[in-house]
Amino acid sequence: IGLVSEGGQWRIENPIDALVVPTSFFDRSFARFNLYFFDQTGRVLLPDPVFIPRGEQTATNLVRGLLAGPGDTIREITRSALPSRTDLDLSVVVTESGVAEVPLSREVLQATPAELTRAVDQLAWTLRQVPGIDRVRITAGGAPVPLAGGRVDAPVTSGSQFDAGGS
């Protein structure tokens, strides 16, 4: 950091355009999670590490991250199963029975059944990291979006076939 004398006082010459916080504050306020995106072949879900503010909006922030797409480091090698231009209508609600209700915009209704299954798998992999979430349910316009087999939700263990580690 360069310093310059200005009017008899020392000033930082080229301050960075960022907020600098102590590590203790960051560790207390944020938690590391992974957003999961499919590789270009669609056979593997790859993690994209992010830091999310701790609190009751963790699931909402994770879904917003998925909808924003992968970060720069993996953008070229991944893709999202969530339909483009899909938005989160409200906050993700986690019911007492552990169902994460993900209210998406109506664009999700344009997905084919296969695309919807992959979108649920992508959401499940990402949301399984949140304690208390056991199942995922996508809604659009306030109504559950039907999944393959007439189901309206899926366990967070969905998509185990996409594990690169084979576990």
Protein language model features and the residues they cover:
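Bimodal "functional hotspot" detector
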Residues: 1-167
